[in-house]
Amino acid sequence: MTLQEEIKKRRTFAIISHPDAGKTTITEQLLKFGGAIREAGTVKARKTGNFAKSDWMDIEKERGISVTSSVMQFDYAGKRVNILDTPGHEDFSEDTYRTLMAVDAAVMVIDSAKGIEAQTKKLFQVVKRRGIPVFTFINKLDRDGREPLDLLSELEEILGIASVPMNWPIGMGKNFQGLYDFTHGRVEVYQPEDGKRFVEFDENGEVPTSHPLTKNPFFTQALEDAELLLDAGNQFSEDEVVAGQLTPVFFGSALTSFGVETFLETFLEYAPEPHSHKTVDEEEIEPLNPDFSGFIFKIQANMDPRHRDRIAFVRIVSGEFERGMDVNLVRTGKKVKLSNVTQFMAESRENVENAVAGDIIGVYDTGTYQVGDTLTTGKLKKSFEPLPTFTPELFMRVQAKNVMKQKSFQKGIDQLVQEGAIQLYKSYTTGDIMLGAVGQLQFEVFKDRMEREYNSETIMTPMGSKIVRWIKEEDLDEKMSSSRNILARDRFDHPLFLFENEFAMRWFKDKYPDVELMEQFSV
């Protein structure tokens, strides 16, 4: 198979949603249909030990939340599928935003009872800005929810994207009968008495009149709604979908696996193949460029706690990876050999000999890489566009509870900060270690991982600081430090100030008008 044919097979996408909409459950079902797992673990089965495959970290298994982005791969219907299961909790949006830089499409999961929720809205805006095609799966049809027409209206009114349903629910909750699949010309029956899951349309494009469904009032209502939508609603356009202007909408129940395989088949038919990426000087690097290139969008420590390893996740942008190849690390200008490279099923992994544009590979990292690094070969020398970061709003001092375990404490700090789990600052005057986060849960996960993975208990003390701003090295003067601010450096040794509030920052600006205070967004 040629390089072009291999690349055209790739479908790389992320699943986004508000917490508890069913994102992890639908991920499990997709993996099951892809033959990657035998049985879908359900988030509700936490006490049974039947944990979700994509939630591999201990704290994720216990709490039923995703706090890291898992990468999973399988083959289905002639396609090589790469799923990135992103964190749903808002405290981990930085990791999610970086992950969205590595995909070609997004699947947006919505709870039929709740509609568009806050985190879904935030994530959609990122997807929209990047022009990523969005496919919508409205979940939990086996429970009572809102009217399907209202949910479609919300997509347009709240998210500002046109929608086109690919199927339509027949009833809902205890009255859920199935899905009217006008895309494939059939009805998918929820709990068929005769064991036949699909009822194919006849030559007139209708359910045969002899079938009991035709006398079902819920089916009659669904038929009327569907005909109205087909006549007056948006028409399906593959070009508009790929351009991110139209979202195909699928209904189903991830928990009961109903409608999921039909969704997968249709999604793979219309989802785009790998696309080009821009370098810092606006050059578009196409997937078929023969030179290998890729960027690191995530670093994860301790995927195998037995070996205390660290993996850098690389999205291949162009060309082909071959085991043992030398690549250029653009940030340092040095050559590195990619000899120990893996692909993933959550925490499970296998060595990979080659991979192509669109694939996600894991490179073992001994401290060489940073999130946002670009790897290239041949004539490609430029970095890709920087990945987004968030400015923390919560800060804590941290120290080792046992001073005799300072070495493991420092190793844990270094690795968790490098993977982007939390931000690190060191006081310019006292040397105190301070952490910054966008939400309280980040601190809790940090403390838990330090104890579990590095055997280092920590003492964490809340700080009064609320704002961080960077300054230029040439503006640095230790005399600017006062009771209203803290002078510090970040992990890249850049100088900064932590302020208690807006008033303290305005006071600083008035006293030092020539010092520029900067927000930092890129790695």
From Swiss-Prot:
Subcellular location field: Cytoplasm
Domain tr-type G: 8-275
Molecular function per GO: GTP binding; GTPase activity; translation release factor activity, codon nonspecific; translation release factor activity, codon specific
Xref: SUPFAM superfamilies: EF-G C-terminal domain-like, P-loop containing nucleoside triphosphate hydrolases, Translation proteins
This protein's GO CC annotations: cytosol
Leader peptide range in chain numbering: none
InterPro entries per the UniProt record, alphabetical: EF-G-like_DII, EFG_III/V, G_TR_CS, P-loop_NTPase, PrfC, RF3_C, RF3_dom_3_sf, RF3_GTP-bd
Coiled-coil intervals: none
Entry annotated with the keyword Ribosomal protein: no
Residues binding GTP, per UniProt: 17-24, 85-89, 139-142
A Pfam family recorded for this sequence: GTP_EFTU
Any one GO biological process: regulation of translational termination
Keywords: Cytoplasm, GTP-binding, Nucleotide-binding, Protein biosynthesis
Record has Glycosyltransferase as a keyword: no
Role of this protein: Increases the formation of ribosomal termination complexes and stimulates activities of RF-1 and RF-2. It binds guanine nucleotides and has strong preference for UGA stop codons. It may interact directly with the ribosome. The stimulation of RF-1 and RF-2 is significantly reduced by GTP and GDP, but not by GMP.
UniProt family annotation: Belongs to the TRAFAC class translation factor GTPase superfamily. Classic translation factor GTPase family. PrfC subfamily.
Entry protein name: Peptide chain release factor 3
Organism: Lactococcus lactis subsp. cremoris (strain MG1363)
